[in-house]
Amino acid sequence: MKIDSWLNDRLDIAKEAGVHRNLRSMNGAPVPERNIDGENQTVWSSNNYLGLASDRRLIDAAQTALQQFGTGSSGSRLTTGNSVWHEKLEKKIASFKRTEAALLFSSGYLANVGVLSSLPEKEDVILSDQLNHASIIDGCRLSKADTVVYRHIDMNDLENKLNETQRYQRRFIVTDGVFSMDGTIVPLDQIISLAKRYHAFVVVDDAHATGVLGDSGRGTSEYFGVYPDIVIGTLSKAVGTEGGFAAGSAVFIDFLLNHARTFIFQTAIPPASCAAAHEAFNIRTSLKNMGYVVKGDHTPIIPVVIGDAHKTVIFAEKLQGKGIYAPAIRPPTVAPGESRIRITITSDHSMGDIDDLLKTFHSIGKELHII
């Protein structure tokens, strides 16, 4: 077909650049030792940070809800899809995040898009970090407000942008709490300080911080002891289930319920997923020394920058040949020249697993003349 010829040309461009992707078949529960495409591998790229996705207590909670509510919600929350489990989980999230209320979305992606496409108005401006997640970028694109991008966690540049945007009616500073490709933590205390000085609102996507940062895992707010206006999050990482949420004031949540299209027109996540997530809330430098460029703060994400996309793919293939699954991260997920192996450490990994990982990185790095 004519369309296939055109699409194949576009796919060939991706292949030549080393950024063509394909799917891998993961067999079994999301634990470190998994069978991938028929090969036994140790997985180092999962977001199951606390090991809860395979926790028996979550599975039991989901099974009990499945027996009572069935496999799907069969409607949007505003029609027939709302259940006691959705409401219980929202109350649990609000309590955990120390906000007045929370609202569930089908994913963290849809939560960001829903908030940013509905809340800021035409006379407003969104100030967005340069390395914010794709869902924030897409939400900004769909918003009626203008968008101004500031340099990654550069507070001087953010302040300059705040000075330059004082003509707008309202300003929203939007940032990841933990940046998923670098593992760096946003200086949220400094952002809150600037927001107060310049009368701006702060929206934080805590997808990779919830359950990980802070003394009780409440995220960047607890880590820094500050309170942003709005917190976005996901249930698919440390919480171990599926779905996303927005948390803030009761008025804000009422607004989203009536205006966020990604909430109004979505089928609600299954009650069983809500029950499992509710249970999850109830449970509560060697690489650098080798000579690798290692980014990241005190989070489970450890990005090891290789640089060239083709070499990164080769590195990932050699890892897999040694029984280690850590896929190559390439453009457009990261900038050109920033291709990397993104390692995520989970509570299910043993010290023996970590030792094996380090030894393998050392040998492959030497073989490919990276270190």
Swiss-Prot record:
GO terms for biological process: biotin biosynthetic process. Its cofactor is pyridoxal 5'-phosphate. Substrate binds at residues 21, 133, 333. Transmembrane segments: none annotated. Its EC number is 2.3.1.47. It comes from the Bacteria. One of its GO terms (molecular function) is pyridoxal phosphate binding. The modification N6-(pyridoxal phosphate)lysine is found at residue 237. It is an enzyme of class 2 (transferase). Pathway: Cofactor biosynthesis; biotin biosynthesis. It catalyses: 6-carboxyhexanoyl-[ACP] + L-alanine + H(+) = (8S)-8-amino-7-oxononanoate + holo-[ACP] + CO2. Pyridoxal 5'-phosphate binds at residues 108-109, 180, 205-208, 234-237. CDD domains: KBL_like. Keywords: Biotin biosynthesis, Pyridoxal phosphate, Transferase. Gene3D superfamilies: Aspartate Aminotransferase, domain 1, Type I PLP-dependent aspartate aminotransferase-like (Major domain). Belongs to the class-II pyridoxal-phosphate-dependent aminotransferase family. BioF subfamily. Catalyzes the decarboxylative condensation of pimeloyl-[acyl-carrier protein] and L-alanine to produce 8-amino-7-oxononanoate (AON), [acyl-carrier protein], and carbon dioxide. Homodimer. This is Putative 8-amino-7-oxononanoate synthase. It comes from Bacillus subtilis subsp. natto. The gene is bioF.
